[in-house]
């Protein structure tokens, strides 16, 4: 359940500290892939105009993939980098916009048909579906059937979750904390990028390893950390938009009657506990003696360190702090 009431809050705001015990590295192919990914994105026609292209150029999204997959070879770094910008482009076009839930729902059939290898009886003409088809082909080429199935299943969950977000925007609903945490694990698309960790590392997880309780637990904690960090860092960008209700800061402020600053501090404590949970479960996964499992765990850790390192320097988020009286970095 949710609520439609709103509050006004005190200013200015400060981000809480975002400590990270995990290593931070940059892939040596970063500059090359950043350039290639932007060219791929322009060719895809997912961006509407030159101004948007320039905004993406300045954001340097190749640096996000280079920080979160520092171990990847050039071809797999290109794959994950292109997938990340597909997600950003889709997010900007459908999720950060004023599109209604019904509009997003009507866009799903062609995307689902691509993911499911269905013959829709006509050529794929939607630019997002065409780019999705191309990315899926590369995942199939670089990974195995099990890896492809994992990725497309969580991608379908991500796409459907956008309808839920849009419905919240449309009805001006602030979701309950329980609903928000559950759905944020899907709306944030993190499971789609986590599903490519073993493709990028070249160490394929078995089905039993993927379903191991410890793997599920550490994946859920890592997911929470990254999306909650994003809710904090992106708050200036989102606070004046229609999507501001789909942010943990406003969810806590609404349902626990916190100030926005108190909500940010609470999120800082929540994400620190989730990191502690990851550290606690790691020894049991190391005991499995699987190189693939350890590579996956390291991949999760790089996602936490890399996403923070990227986001605190990216124009996608920092520009909003400069143009609005919103959070500053402590």
Swiss-Prot record:
GO terms for molecular function: metal ion binding; terpene synthase activity. The record marks 88 as: Plays a critical role in the stabilization of intermediate cation. The record marks 92, 165 as: Plays a critical role for substrate recognition. It is an enzyme of class 4 (lyase). Its EC number is 4.2.3.170. Mg(2+) 2 binds at residue 96. Gene3D superfamilies: Farnesyl Diphosphate Synthase (1.10.600.10). The Asp-Asp-Xaa-Xaa-Xaa-Glu (DDXXXE) motif is important for the catalytic activity, presumably through binding to Mg(2+). This is 4-epi-cubebol synthase ((2E,6E)-farnesyl diphosphate cyclizing). It comes from Streptosporangium roseum (strain ATCC 12428 / DSM 43021 / JCM 3005 / KCTC 9067 / NCIMB 10171 / NRRL 2505 / NI 9100).
């Amino acid at each position: 359940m949710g609520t439609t009431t709103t509050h006004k809050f005190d200013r200015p705001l400060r981000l809480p500290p975002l400590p990270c015990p995990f290593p931070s590295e940059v892939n040596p192919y970063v500059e090359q892939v950043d350039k290639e990914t932007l060219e791929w994105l322009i060719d895809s026609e997912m961006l509407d105009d030159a101004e948007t292209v320039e905004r993406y150029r300045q954001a340097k999204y190749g640096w996000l993939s280079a920080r979160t997959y520092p171990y990847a070879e050039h071809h797999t770094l290109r794959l994950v980098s292109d997938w990340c910008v597909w997600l950003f482009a889709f997010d900007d076009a459908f999720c950060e916009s004023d599109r209604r839930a019904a509009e997003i729902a009507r866009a799903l059939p062609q995307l689902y048909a691509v993911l499911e290898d269905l013959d829709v009886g006509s050529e794929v003409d939607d630019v997002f579906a065409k780019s999705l088809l191309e990315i899926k082909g590369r995942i199939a080429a670089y990974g195995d059937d099990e890896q492809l199935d994992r990725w497309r299943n969580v991608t379908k969950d991500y796409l459907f979750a956008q309808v839920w977000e849009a419905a919240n925007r449309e009805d001006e609903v602030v979701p309950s904390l329980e609903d928000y945490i559950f759905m944020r694990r899907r709306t944030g698309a993190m499971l789609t990028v986590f599903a490519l960790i073993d493709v990028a590392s070249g160490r394929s997880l078995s089905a039993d390893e993927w379903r191991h309780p410890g793997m599920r637990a550490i994946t859920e904690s890592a997911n929470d950390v990254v999306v909650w960090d994003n809710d904090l860092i992106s708050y200036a960008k989102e606070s004046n938009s229609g999507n501001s209700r789909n942010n943990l800061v406003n969810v806590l402020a609404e349902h626990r009657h916190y100030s926005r600053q108190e909500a940010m501090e609470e999120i800082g404590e929540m994400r620190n506990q989730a990191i502690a949970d990851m550290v606690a479960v790691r020894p049991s996964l190391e005991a499995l003696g699987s190189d693939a499992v350890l590579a996956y765990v390291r991949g999760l850790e790089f996602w936490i360190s890399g996403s923070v390192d990227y986001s605190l320097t990216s124009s996608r988020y920092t520009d909003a702090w400069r143009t609005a009286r919103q959070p500053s970095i402590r």
